[in-house]
Amino acid sequence: MLGQEIYVNPARGRQYNPDDFAGILQKYEADVKVQYLIKNMDIQYPLTVIRTKLKEAFVSWENLDSFITGLTNSLYNGMYIDEFKWTKALVSSAYKNNMVNVETVSSPLTSVDLAKAFTVKARELFLNFQMPTTSYNAWSKVGGSGRPITTWTAPEDIVILIRNDVRAYMDVEVLANAFQIDKAVLLGNIYPVDSFDVYSDEGEKIFDGSNIFGMIADRNWFKIKPVDQFMENGYNANNRAMQYFLNNIKMYEFSLFANAVVFATTEATVNPTAFKFLVNGEEKTSITITKATDVEVVTTPYSANASITYASSAEGKATVAKKSGANKVITITPVADGSANITATVGEVTGTLAVTVDV
């Protein structure tokens, strides 16, 4: 663990009561939230330079030194490219794991359509981000404890990531007027990207980010912190080679507290790996019911959003149904004395709640 981000929710006011003398003896705790962050980038860029071999290919020391400088610069170029990829991957990761709010625009649409839709909705979000709201951070979305947090963003801290094929159809002049912000300031807060795909070190695509075409966020959503960066080198006299090692150690995380909305043509589907059942906030593996009872179904991860199928092993004893269409709240209704197992299933993952009916 590298550190933590601490957020203190705004205090809630109360109506003044001149007769409340006992209130001075109560404890009023601040609503403090904590997100733990880790160092997750530790990359080394190696390079071997054998000067005697290089000298054979050059007619002057000046050309040789210039070439060696180009070789060492390649280490930094590789590092900067990786940092660009890691930054884009933050957006892809948050979207893929359903840990960020998503604004969907129905497809199929052309880049022109996406640009128009983005401009209109981004204008609305640009204004809403500046108001105290619980709607655009991901704290509750990922199962953060306590009440939802209230956040807001200064207009100069709102940044936009946009895919190049969509950005090409966006008129920055119109956008600046719509946002009521200086064009130069807006341009400084727009970051065009080629795509939100994620690739392995071998160049294999490991995440298809074609559904994502943009993002509007508080710049503090990006938790990118340098830990250490240094160059080391050593000379190997045995083969007259100089070894260079550029080390880059950083933290690449995203904040659950900051406002952020991803624009995509569809939401990502996250499957659960486990279920648990809560009745009045307490985890249960078995319950006894005498009347219709609501049960909260909590998934691992909490942000899993795949549609859950519920079933009763004995509908003559108890039935189960999603409450008001909610995916993770069910109502178990008694039918006759006896027992039944209520199951929650997604794919091959199943959770079971044993129910005893006593009517």
Where are these regions (language model features)?
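Surface-exposed assembly/interface segments
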Residues: M1, L64-D65, V359
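Assembly/oligomerization interface modules of large self-assembling protein complexes
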Residues: M1-L47
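Long, contiguous amphipathic alpha-helices that act as assembly "spine/axial" helices in icosahedral shell
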Residues: K33-E103, M242-N247
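Residue-level signal for alpha-helical context at structural boundaries
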Residues: A89-S93, V262, S313
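Extended, solvent-exposed, turn-rich assembly/linker loops in the middle of proteins
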Residues: N98-S195
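Extracytoplasmic soluble-region selector
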Residues: V270-V359
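Extended, compositionally biased alpha-helical segments that mediate assembly or anchoring
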Residues: Q180-T273
